[in-house]
Amino acid sequence: MKQTKYIFVTGGVLSSLGKGIAAASIATLLKNSGLKASILKADPYINVDPGTMSPFEHGEVFVTDDGAETDLDLGHYERFLDESLSQDNNFTTGRVYQSVIEKERRGEYLGKTIQVIPHIVGEIKDRIKKAGEGKDILIVEIGGTVGDIEGLPFLEAIRALRLEVGKNNAMNIHLTLVPFIKAAGELKTKPTQHSVGELRRIGISPDMIICRSEKALDRDLKDKIAISCGVEKNCVIESVDAASIYQIPLNFLKQDILNPIAEILDLKNLKPNMENWDSLVKRVIAPSNEVKIAFVGKYVDLKESYKSLTEAIIHAGAALDTKVELKWVDSEKLENMESAEVFKDVSGILVAGGFGYRGVEGKIKAIQYARENKIPFLGICLGMQLALVEFARNVLKLKDANSSEFDEKCENPVVYLIDEFMDTNGEKQIRTAKTPLGGTMRLGAYKCDIKEKSLLAKVYNEAKSVKERHRHRYEANPKYRVDFEKHGLIVSGESKGLIEAVELNCHPFFLAVQFHPEFTSRLEHVNPVICGFIKAAINYEDN
């Protein structure tokens, strides 16, 4: 069997430098060179997965087709690679320890003392190898920063794995910060030197340095970094702040990043075809048109909470040659504001998902304003559920209508908790209000059957069904379906009896979906729901 080659990506100095974007950019170039490339994110935190972490703590939880709740970097990987990944492409310290402890309880270690080396490190290596099966090359991003105590087992694993597979089958790329000191008017390399020194103490010598900086590095500075860090001069790559993250692969390509990679890994001459990508990036950076939409959410102070959705909107804008300006609206603050004043200058209203009661009434106000004023509207996940609540209260006149998530004693629960459902593996899952939160939602891709001649059908180019990803615990209550449809709110999408999409039949564009269309949107293949909504907003603006 052909040996998979590995590129290990580590980060130094501080976090949030963009290791995920750098890794995804390199993977994109390799894939477009004809290689079967994939990416793995290894997170050193002890949570089993990010599913129960606060959006303010971790940002978005990205969901894969097979229902894994993963790091938001997996979203970047999918959007850059234009491929669907799985639970094998992300794991945490918590997941590793959970697996090792379960094996110990089953007696698989035959009574041995369980230790970080070899057992924890061995589990990490096994998971890396599994993710690389059937691939020409696997890029492994190690979360956190070199020097973090929780990252040591991961660094030991990649050190050992490189020795195991041989020098032409693995390389290390270290991404570090080269800060610009305004008072001195110069870039400083000392943090990079210290970071590489820390990495070497662990037993890893980088083959390539990627330098994050707000200003370009001149040749002398690159040579200084190469000499002090012990890498070839053509292996110092700059990653300067860009107008769009989708520029990064093109910026890397201009610096011939693939030449040293091909040399180190003994690969054929790599010449990626990036023409279509380049064309789309130009439309992202300098589009011909502009439209403004309101983005109504409860986590608007941390935009990373909606990373896939904001990226999907960028994809739609590129496809339509339009800059989409987002007007961020805090749903909690909206409760005490005048809707007409807030939405007077927008051509569309998007109500995003979320959990918990805070800000719910503000979202309902936004939905009511979009419905009554015939402004293009898209509701996602909780946004669909609240569209049902708003319609029930203001059209069906069920003033106490609510979701049982927010009022368990509600007499008209138009949204409720179902006790049983089939997961993506076809297995029955049972949940109650007291079920543990971790991993108990309806997660992953499910088939949605589409009503003929509906807005949803038009958006999906008359497809009879689609598969989209979910992450929710509560469902639309079918008890109210007849009354909803009698008054014009049509169910246009279903999944084995569960309501997946609703729309208004006397409105230019009023669509609400239970699934998350943003999770399957890519720069080169925008999700039809997002694109349809932005197109409707453009038409509203023009008219």
Curated annotation (Swiss-Prot):
Pathway participation: Pyrimidine metabolism; CTP biosynthesis via de novo pathway; CTP from UDP: step 2/2
UniProt-annotated catalytic positions: 381, 516, 518
Amidoligase domain: annotated span: 1-267
Residue ranges of domain Glutamine amidotransferase type-1 in the record: 292-543
Activity regulation: Allosterically activated by GTP, when glutamine is the substrate; GTP has no effect on the reaction when ammonia is the substrate. The allosteric effector GTP functions by stabilizing the protein conformation that binds the tetrahedral intermediate(s) formed during glutamine hydrolysis. Inhibited by the product CTP, via allosteric rather than competitive inhibition.
NCBIfam families according to UniProt: PRK05380.1, PyrG
Gene Ontology terms for molecular function: ATP binding; CTP synthase activity; glutaminase activity; identical protein binding; metal ion binding
Organism: Campylobacter jejuni subsp. doylei (strain ATCC BAA-1458 / RM4099 / 269.97)
UniProt name for this protein: CTP synthase
Catalytic reaction annotation: UTP + L-glutamine + ATP + H2O = CTP + L-glutamate + ADP + phosphate + 2 H(+); L-glutamine + H2O = L-glutamate + NH4(+); UTP + NH4(+) + ATP = CTP + ADP + phosphate + 2 H(+)
Binding site residues for CTP: 15, 148-150, 188-193, 224
Binding site for UTP: 15, 188-193, 224
Note: CTPSs have evolved a hybrid strategy for distinguishing between UTP and CTP. The overlapping regions of the product feedback inhibitory and substrate sites recognize a common feature in both compounds, the triphosphate moiety. To differentiate isosteric substrate and product pyrimidine rings, an additional pocket far from the expected kinase/ligase catalytic site, specifically recognizes the cytosine and ribose portions of the product inhibitor.
Keyword Transferase appears in the UniProt entry: no
Biological role: Catalyzes the ATP-dependent amination of UTP to CTP with either L-glutamine or ammonia as the source of nitrogen. Regulates intracellular CTP levels through interactions with the four ribonucleotide triphosphates.
